[in-house]
Amino acid sequence: MIPMRKIKLLSPRLANQIAAGEVVERPSSVIKELLENSLDAGATRLDIEIEDGGIKLMRVRDNGGGIDKDDLPLALSRHATSKIYELDDLEAVATLGFRGEALASISSVARLALVSSTSEDSAGWQVVAEGRDMETQISPAPHPRGTTVEVRDLFFNTPARRKFLRSEKTEYTHLEDVVKRLALSRFDVAFNLRHNGRAIYAWRAGDSQLEQERRVAQVCGPAFMENAVFIEMERGSLRLWGWVAQPTFSRSQADLQHFYVNGRAIRDKLVSHAVRQAYQDVLYHGRHPAFVLYLELDPSTVDVNVHPTKHEVRFRDNRTVHDFIYSSLHHALAKVRPEDTLARKAADLGEDTPGIAPYAVSPRPLVEGIAAGEFKGQGAMSFAPSTSGGYRPGYTSVSPGTIREQMHTYGELLASAEPVTARALPQTPTEDIPPLGYALAQLKGIYILAENAQGLIVVDMHAAHERITYERMKAAYAHGGLQTQPLLVPESIAVSEKEADCAEQFADIFKTLGFELQRAGPETLLIRQLPVILNRAQAEQLVRDVLSDLIEHGTSERIQHHINEILATMACHGSVRANRKLTIPEMNALLRDMEATERSGQCNHGRPTWFLQSLDELDKLFMRGQ
């Protein structure tokens, strides 16, 4: 039994060391507090020097407003701050720090020296604390306007805490992550980082979008920016802007996710759910999206004082914020088209972007052997003299929709087609070439090879057609249900009694999905109607898979919540299969539909549907021009 002990008031030192357990976990915690103080002081330049991963030394110098001599003793006192004076200030706090605990907690577990000046004549003052009972002495110390805080020998007086520190490399990695997060929060501030005497980063300040993108590329890597889409959405007092990576740039870990609320880096469950929901339709299972996003809203509508390290926040209207983030990202991802990706690719290669003609309306045959140079609905090939000498082919413009209707393309994929021999592209102005170019050939019955203005396009035809079918089915379902087509001869399938019961229980849902099923026995179903868009699918297996999904999700409410998963299952059955030989017109029609379809860069499972191998990249493979 624990003996009864008297209640005693803790000493200032012990109280601060206990508080340090929440505030100071490792060197990265110290750097976070010091940098936030500098940013709150109005600094436009931060110089950070680290030794031994921050365990031996952390020094931060800024050019902010500095601290008055008379305020220096208070700077290291607990619950002393210049950022809030009363409760009303806390409800709309705009600074990163406000509790007045950081320096007191740090100085209780490390050797801390603070030098500051508020004047331009380099007349500064220094205060030192080394884990003592808050006894500090002030002495003159030359220093330009601003503040330098030096922290040495972290946890030197608390061995139990020190033994929990990891290796120098691990601690430095955590520290570097903190610097990166803060560098992304303030593009208008220059950051310079040195470790063990070696310059690591030197990020210049800049406010233009080009300078911001340069900072993001430096912090997150150029590959992120190559695959990122800039978004900016506003609704009332809410504004969301930043960069989101395309789903094909997903990550195995959630290590490239930066979200800021009024400039404060946070990790919030509500935000994470909204982002995850926006990506769920295009992200491969087990993968994580990458993004750098900034949410701006009225400070009085968000509470930042709910977590010791201020990583979590609480919104006054959770549902409004969640739906705004979700709808903004969902809309942005849906609007990404192949020409957007190709334009960024060209920019990264230092090229102009000719040929990026969204929804080009002048498709043309690429090969000889199609009815004397033409196919249904398209004018015969003619040759017009070019201004550069020689000849170039000319074509009659026809809309993609007309071509699709008149040549009965891949919607009738099982129809017979005459073989077509592909040959080289005629030389035509690049502005006539649509984003995904024109088909050249089919590889192994799986991939479509096409040429566009920049190089070679490779398309996974099943994945691409699956996405197109899926998006059409979602649109039809949202407008009242899928159109149905009766079977000339109803098809009978044997099912379990549970599956037959499910078909009867959810008959209305099946009808909305375009099916008509009739129970013909305890374990028998008749398929009388199928969705028109899936008229070439294998009816029996399609119905079995939909039944399986409905049984898995159970109630009608859950089924409606997971309806996209069911539609994705159906779309997979209705899409062109591997080893199906397509004609050149069919391939071109598929490319045009990809250009006009939302989220066509990924299949329903999040895998990419196409990629570009630029001419420069091909030249490098063959070492041309080297």
Curated annotation (Swiss-Prot):
SMART domains from the UniProt entry: DNA_mis_repair, MutL_C
Coiled-coil annotated residue ranges, if any: none
Family the UniProt entry places it in: Belongs to the DNA mismatch repair MutL/HexB family.
CDD domains in UniProt: HATPase_MutL-MLH-PMS-like (cd16926), MutL_Trans_MutL (cd03482)
Entry-linked PROSITE patterns: DNA_MISMATCH_REPAIR_1
Any one annotated GO CC term: mismatch repair complex
Keyword Ligase: no
Record GO biological process: mismatch repair
Pfam families: DNA_mis_repair, HATPase_c_3, MutL_C
The species this protein was found in: Cellvibrio japonicus (strain Ueda107) (Pseudomonas fluorescens subsp. cellulosa)
Role of this protein: This protein is involved in the repair of mismatches in DNA. It is required for dam-dependent methyl-directed DNA mismatch repair. May act as a 'molecular matchmaker', a protein that promotes the formation of a stable complex between two or more DNA-binding proteins in an ATP-dependent manner without itself being part of a final effector complex.
Lineage: Bacteria, Pseudomonadati, Pseudomonadota, Gammaproteobacteria, Cellvibrionales
Keyword DNA repair found: yes
Domain of life according to the entry: Bacteria
UniProt keyword terms in alphabetical order: DNA damage, DNA repair
UniProt name for this protein: DNA mismatch repair protein MutL
GO molecular function: ATP binding; ATP hydrolysis activity; ATP-dependent DNA damage sensor activity; mismatched DNA binding
